[in-house]
């Protein structure tokens, strides 16, 4: 428990290994790989609590998270730490210290207003911006279309769950010699978003990767029709890399399970009020 609280209050990170060899690519747009246990067993424990919250009416979610949904300023904090003075979002600037893509639903918890759902058996979709592997679209590679000689490539990932995000990180670990994942204090600890910071480009592999992508998409520039789910590797990445990734993501999901459990206990408290011991513990933890 102390470790969970420490990660929430101080943040957590991991440095991923560099691989000189790019994995065999086979880009297919339109569908994500399905989840499986080898890509994170903790998710399947944590998703049970997410489903409990997913059943709650959204007006109640807004009420109980109003004071703990602080503005997500993690990207700004990363810019400050790395002394990044200028960033390039989707080709909007020709000169920058970093090229950036934010795939997260910044400062949002749910997708649409909704009443309560009777039971988990009646859930047909994930209405929360939490643990939704379908949120990872091919936009995660969009910065590479705009990358010239920037020092950093920075991605705000919408989720850490599923094969898609692990395959993506494995590819980035052959495109850049330094790839780090961070879950900052100033990110939302209600959601499984995180930041990837990559630097020291390995141009040989970047050129190979972009050649494959451009041949599949039949375009040398980014097209908005590419903002879809995708799969990119036929073969699973090696177990060593998966375990290194899970070393980081498990810390995040353990913290989220604790936070979500407190929130659910607060929302279902006998007091029928936002003034209860679970909410007080939650506020103390996150503020």
Swiss-Prot record:
Q: Which UniProt keywords apply?
A: mRNA capping, mRNA processing, Transcription, Transcription regulation, Transcription termination, Virion
Q: Does the keyword Cell inner membrane apply?
A: no
Give the chief site where it resides.
virion
Top-level taxon of origin? Viruses
Q: Which GO terms describe its cellular component?
A: virion component
The free-text function statement in the UniProt record for this protein reads:
Acts with RNA polymerase to initiate transcription from late gene promoters.
Q: What is this protein called?
A: mRNA-capping enzyme regulatory subunit OPG124
Gene coding for it: OPG124
